[in-house]
Every structure is written in structure tokens, then in C-alpha cells.
Amino acid sequence: MDQQPIQVIGGGLAGTEAAWQIAQAGVPVILHEMRPKRFSPAHHTEHLAELVCSNSFGAMASDRAAGLLHEELRQLGSVVIAKADEHAVPAGGALAVDRGQFGQDLTQTLASHPLVEFRRGEVPYIPEGIVVLATGPLTSPDLAADLHRFTGMEYMSFFDAASPIIVGDSINRDIAFMASRYDKGEAAYLNCPMNKEQYLRFREELCKAEQTELKDFERETAKFFEACLPIEELAQRGEDTMRYGPVKPVGLSDSRTGERPYAVVQLRQEDKAGQLWNMVGFQTNLRWGEQKRVFQMIPGLEKAEFVRLGVMHRNTFINAPQLMLPTLQFKQRPTLLAAGQLIGTEGYTAAAAGGWLAGTNAARLALGKEPLALPPTTMLGALLEFISSASPKHFQPMPPNFGILPDLGMKIKSKPERYGRYRDRSLADLSSWKVNLT
């Protein structure tokens, strides 16, 4: 009996990688891409894996988060990273590509594979059978509506208004204090107190800071999100607007001094290990350099290390912790898998990495094998563990970063040495794990 082809919807980085891994496993695959019959607001070519923003895949060095993920994908046989290496252009310490040659080569490579069938045109609903969804942040309206129905209205977002996330070890605990408002429950927030002078100076710089312009199609979506206003917009509305919003001091006092601050920036724990902390209510459109400059004015955050800076943009993504397994299968339908920005991973390399696992596991399902999850000590394993186990209530997309990796079990002050240890452990564990792929 002929094997039923797996369907991959979306020809971006995740879908391209997924389709390749399926075909390489000896399973036929249909790759659906709506371009050129229908273009999203951000795409301009009909090539697979079109890079619509930067042409950079991030830092190359393997003791950097992106570089470590590159190296893991090289070990796993990623076609996206292989072609990125082949079409690399000089970019200092980053892996950047000639985007035209990169997209053309990937398109030709997949088109020449005997087990890959291209279908150009929009897919308006989720098909039956084994399916990989990789439709990205600009998923077409009809398919987004069907996915919305499948996941439930409360488990899907259409706009990403995210606050910065900070490495816990970089927060000055001599200034920041643990407490919950009105001392309700356990002390769950790190609180950075400000006096009046500090607050007014912070607000002044926040109002002057340069912003990133939303694209037209993003502006239309953003205007509905009054509850997610950028922190700089609140600052501009009046001297005390923030003090009645995200930085309100009521119900908080520093037990060390007994005093109530004039304003308080709260940080909420983002991961189980308490290594990542989210700036509550600090979604922002500020340029990244400006975010670092202004937010490091906050007492306790003078040396803050940001693993993710704030963003506000159009981004269709699901509540992965509620819906997904670390194998990238949907809990309620294990034959449906997803990858890329749709599941809340952020960045080109993470999209390709998720595509690798979704494609690998889709093929395993078709071949009657058990799906696999990667070791959480690897960057890819840690990222997928995070997106499938973070708090569903506060879930926001996450890029690769060392803060999501399990603790090394020892204190290493030197950042290069610490990251090098993470890298060595990750690559060793991945090498051992690869025997499961047979």
C-alpha cells in the first residue's frame, strides 16, 4: 500500500526544514505555500524560506545562544543551516546570508527531491492525517480562523506585546526586594523601588527615547490593544500615569526599610528555575538600544542582561504551554504538529530548529515510531521544554538564550567560561542522544 504523504503547511524556514527532514526519512511530503498566488503583507518573492527582516541568523560563536543552536542543527543535518553556511556573507561575528541565493537554493533543493511535492496556493483549513503547521506570524486569515476554532479562542494571539526578559543573576538583589502586593500569598515578585527623583528622571528619558515604527498592517491590529499600551505611551500621557499603572507602589513596602517607594517596577518569574524575570507591564516600541539605555536606569537593573527585549508587532501564535508537547505535537491531536513562530519560538534559527523536530517526529509517526524530545540540556531541547511548560497565563514568545538551560550545578562568575560549559554539555548530550534517531 502506498504511504500517505505528510502535509506541511507553510514554506518558511520551519516548513522548509520540516519538509526536508520528512523526505530524507523516506516519507512522501506535500509542501503547501500560498505564494505567489497570495502574498502576506511582508513577503515579496515566491521562494521558500524568504527572510523578510534581517538577513542574519545571529552570532556564529558556539558559546553564544544562537551560535550553539547553529552547531546543534549542523550535527542534526539541518538543510537550512547547511544552506546558510553555503551562502554566508561577511557580517563580523554573525551568520548572515545572501538572502536571494539562499532562498533560491533552498527552493531548488526541495523541488529536486523525489519525495517532495510542491503545491502553490492557500490552505484554508487544517487537513486530516499527519500535518505540520508552519504558517508563521502572518498566517492567512482563513487558516488562522480554523486554527482559532481548533485551539479555542483564549489560546491564540494575533499581536505580540511583550515585555523585556532579564537574566536573574544580573539583577542587583541589594536593591530589588521580593514581595507580593499587600503581602498576599508568598513573595512572588522582584520589586525595583524608585524615589521621586529617580522616577521623574526615568520618565523623562522614557518620553525622549526613540521608537520603532509599526508597519501599516501592524498598526491596524495594534489599535485594538488599549490594555497593552507601550510603557512609553503611558509615560507621555501624564506624570503619574505609570504610577497608577505598571509601576504603582500601593501595597508594596521594602521590609528592609519599612518604607513605601514612590514607584515600583515589578519583575515576574518567567521559568521554573527562576533564572529569567519579566518586566511586568513594560511592553514597548522603543528601539533596542534605547530599551537597554533607559531600562538600566531603573534601580537594581543597572547591569541587567536582557535575553529578550520588548516588542510590539503582528504575530499569530498559540499558547504552546496549554496546547503542545515538547515533541511539538498538539496534546488534543497527536498527528498535528507545529513549528516556528506560530508556537512561540522567536528568530530564524529557532524556526528552523523547530521545523527539524516537527519534521522528524512527523516522519516517525508515519513510520510507526515513537516521537522524540531532545535533552533539555541542549539549546533546542531547552527552548521546546520552555514553550511547552511555561506559565500559560503569561506566555510570550521566547528566543534561544542561556537562561533557559538547566543550571550547571556550580557557580561560574566568568560569563565566557560559563557559556562555554553550557556549550560543551549541550553538544556532548546531543551527540549521545543522536543514537535515538535510528
From Swiss-Prot:
EC number of the protein: 2.1.1.74
Reactions mediated catalytically: uridine(54) in tRNA + (6R)-5,10-methylene-5,6,7,8-tetrahydrofolate + NADH + H(+) = 5-methyluridine(54) in tRNA + (6S)-5,6,7,8-tetrahydrofolate + NAD(+); uridine(54) in tRNA + (6R)-5,10-methylene-5,6,7,8-tetrahydrofolate + NADPH + H(+) = 5-methyluridine(54) in tRNA + (6S)-5,6,7,8-tetrahydrofolate + NADP(+)
Domain of life: Bacteria
Major location category of this protein: cytoplasm
Keywords: Cytoplasm, FAD, Flavoprotein, Methyltransferase, NAD, NADP, Transferase, tRNA processing
Gene3D superfamilies assigned to the protein according to its UniProt record, in alphabetical order: FAD/NAD(P)-binding domain
Classification via Pfam families: GIDA
GO cellular component: cytosol
GO molecular function, one term: tRNA (uracil(54)-C5)-methyltransferase activity, 5,10-methylenetetrahydrofolate-dependent
Top enzyme category: transferase
Protein known as: Methylenetetrahydrofolate--tRNA-(uracil-5-)-methyltransferase TrmFO
Species, as recorded: Nostoc sp. (strain PCC 7120 / SAG 25.82 / UTEX 2576)
